């Protein structure tokens, strides 16, 4: 179920403040965030965020195509090692 239009996109308040500080300073540093649920806004384009995946911060460079998506979509939390090999085939 999609979010209601009258509510607008969800973004944590501290995230807006951090992004504004980096824009004012003109620095190109990675902004560490823990809010995977926040929506990417147009004012975040060009910035790099370190999105926490449960163990480390994954750098995510925001571009125009990402606007409207959530930060968590670009920082996978699970590692896929592939399906287990067939034990019968290994013995031969």
Curated annotation (Swiss-Prot):
Name used for this protein in its record: Small ribosomal subunit protein uS19
Alphabetized PANTHER family for the sequence: RIBOSOMAL PROTEIN S19P FAMILY MEMBER, SMALL RIBOSOMAL SUBUNIT PROTEIN US19M
Organism per entry: Rhizobium johnstonii (strain DSM 114642 / LMG 32736 / 3841)
InterPro entries according to UniProt: Ribosomal_uS19, Ribosomal_uS19_bac-type, Ribosomal_uS19_CS, Ribosomal_uS19_SF
GO cellular component term, pick one: small ribosomal subunit
Record keywords: Ribonucleoprotein, Ribosomal protein, RNA-binding, rRNA-binding
GO biological process per UniProt: ribosomal small subunit assembly; translation
Function: Protein S19 forms a complex with S13 that binds strongly to the 16S ribosomal RNA.
Classification via Pfam families: Ribosomal_S19
MF term (GO), any: structural constituent of ribosome
Family stated for the protein in its record: Belongs to the universal ribosomal protein uS19 family.
